[in-house]
Amino acid sequence: MFRKLILLAIVIFIANSFYSRDHGGTTKAASSAPSSKHSTGSVSAPVVAPPRWRYVNPTDAISGKSYRLAQVKSVNSLALDYPYRGANFGTLSVRQHPQFGLDVIVSVEKGQILCPGDDYWTCVFMIRFDEGEPERFTAKKAADGSSTVVFAAYPKWALQKLRAAKKITVQLLMYQSGNQVLTFEVEEPLDW
C-alpha cells in the first residue's frame, strides 16, 4: 500500500510540473530566482530549427505493402470562429499509395474547407510557390465527405512544384471564416 501511495505522489508531482510549464505557471525554483534591477529588458529568442519535410513509410493494412508519405506542418494557424477557435494548423502531404496512387493533400486540424463553384466535388483555391505568382490550385473533396481535407486534382503538377519550393502558401475558403491562408516553409524542397 505504501508503495502505491509513493507512486501516486510521484505521478501527481510529474503531472503538476508538466501542467505548470504548459499553462504559464512557474516552478518554485524559477519563481525564486533573483531579479536584476539593471535588466535591459531584452530576452534572446531560442534558436528554432527550420521546418523539414517528415518522411515515413507506413504499411497499408489491406495490401500489406509499404507506401511513401511526406508531410510538413504549417508555420501558422488558421483564425477561425467558434466552434473551431484555437490553434488550428494545416498539413501538406505527399503520398504514393499502392491502392490510391499519387496524392498531394492539404488538410486542417478542424473546420470546414468549402469548395466554391458549380461542381460540388471540385474546389479551386490559390497557391503560391516561393515568391512566384499566385496560381489556381484545383482540388477534389475527400471521397468520404470529410471537410478537413482536399486532394490535388493534378498531383503530378503539384509534385513538380513542391520539388523546387521552400515556401508554399495556400489560400482556402473556410466555412463562416472566409479565405484563410496557410504557409508551409521548409529548409529544403521536397525530396521525392
Located regions from the model:
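A generic "folded-domain core" signal
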Residues: Y19-W192
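Alpha-helical transmembrane anchor segments and their immediate juxtamembrane flanks
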Residues: M1-T26
